[in-house]
């Protein structure tokens, strides 16, 4: 039996559908009355751990899970050593730079030197501004980063944007996209090397069923 780390939240339903098409059914994890954090597939070939999206790479990297599904945004921010296996295509959103709508900033280089930029993704934000050679101070927030510009604490934010509704409702606009993030299938490198084809068969099954959906 191998172990899979499933992300709580927005990616969970599509993650469960992905494994179900590959023959591993963890649908009981969707039962809101079920408080369990571990689930066996109906076929008893695999076990799932229900964890926070940001913790998926940790469980996979440390070997507590052989496979996992996580957003590319989290994967890129974590910088943990995992095998990057498949782009699953769902959960799409942009990592974006946004400012107040009534500001004078229309592109990244308009931002004043050493200004404050609020973000949950501090490594991603820092790397982005370093590549642009723009000196800024990254302010780490774990909640609603939109409050940074609203309160005047920050000139801009770096955050995930799906529909743009939250930005619009808070008087913010995008001025740049850093990258497009989708759900990714990842694996533990050692588990992949020691695999007796159970993981490989699952990965190939996911890849083939995903291709059929895209067609």
Swiss-Prot record:
**What are the UniProt keywords, alphabetically?**
Amino-acid biosynthesis, ATP-binding, Cytoplasm, Glycosyltransferase, Histidine biosynthesis, Nucleotide-binding, Transferase
Annotated HAMAP family:
HisG_Short
User: By its UniProt entry, which PROSITE patterns does this protein fall under?
Assistant: ATP_P_PHORIBOSYLTR (PS01316)
Task: Please give the pathway this protein is involved in.
Answer: Amino-acid biosynthesis; L-histidine biosynthesis; L-histidine from 5-phospho-alpha-D-ribose 1-diphosphate: step 1/9
| Keyword Glycosyltransferase annotated | yes
Per the UniProt record, which EC number(s) apply here?
A: 2.4.2.17
Cell compartment(s), UniProt: Cytoplasm
Name the InterPro entries on file: ATP_PRibTrfase_cat, ATP_PRibTrfase_CS, ATP_PRibTrfase_HisG, ATP_PRibTrfase_HisG_short
Q: Where is the signal peptide?
A: none
The protein's job, in short, is: Catalyzes the condensation of ATP and 5-phosphoribose 1-diphosphate to form N'-(5'-phosphoribosyl)-ATP (PR-ATP). Has a crucial role in the pathway because the rate of histidine biosynthesis seems to be controlled primarily by regulation of HisG enzymatic activity.
| The protein's assembly and partners | Heteromultimer composed of HisG and HisZ subunits.
Of which family is this protein a member?
Belongs to the ATP phosphoribosyltransferase family. Short subfamily.
Q: What class of enzyme is it?
A: transferase
Notes on the domains: Lacks the C-terminal regulatory region which is replaced by HisZ.
**Reactions catalysed:** 1-(5-phospho-beta-D-ribosyl)-ATP + diphosphate = 5-phospho-alpha-D-ribose 1-diphosphate + ATP
- The protein here is known as ATP phosphoribosyltransferase
Q: Name one GO biological process term.
A: L-histidine biosynthetic process
| UniProt gene name | hisG
GO CC annotation: cytoplasm
Q: Name one Pfam family in it.
A: HisG
**Species in which this protein is naturally found:** Prochlorococcus marinus (strain MIT 9215)
Q: Which GO terms describe its molecular function?
A: ATP binding; ATP phosphoribosyltransferase activity
Q: Does the keyword Lipid metabolism apply?
A: no
């Amino acid at each position: 039996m191998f172990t899979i780390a499933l992300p709580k939240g927005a990616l969970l339903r599509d993650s469960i559908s992905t494994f179900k098409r590959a023959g591993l059914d963890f649908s009981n994890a969707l039962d809101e009355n079920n408080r369990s954090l571990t689930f066996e597939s109906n076929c008893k070939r695999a076990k799932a751990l229900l964890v926070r999206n940001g913790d998926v790479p940790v469980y996979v990297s440390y070997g507590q899970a052989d496979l996992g599904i996580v957003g590319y945004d989290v994967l890129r921010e974590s910088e943990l050593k995992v095998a990057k296996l498949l782009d699953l295509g769902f959960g799409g959103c942009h990592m974006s730079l946004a400012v107040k709508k009534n500001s004078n900033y229309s592109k990244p280089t308009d931002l004043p030197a050493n200004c404050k930029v609020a973000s949950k993704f501090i490594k991603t934000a820092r790397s982005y501004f370093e590549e642009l050679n723009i000196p800024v101070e990254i302010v780490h927030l774990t909640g609603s980063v939109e409050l940074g510009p609203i309160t005047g604490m920050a000139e801009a934010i770096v955050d995930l944007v799906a529909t743009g509704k939250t930005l619009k409702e808070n008087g913010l606009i995008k001025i740049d996209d850093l990258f497009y993030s989708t759900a990714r299938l990842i694996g533990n490198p050692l588990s992949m090397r020691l695999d007796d084809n159970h993981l490989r068969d699952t990965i190939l099954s996911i890849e083939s069923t995903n291709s059929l959906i895209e067609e």
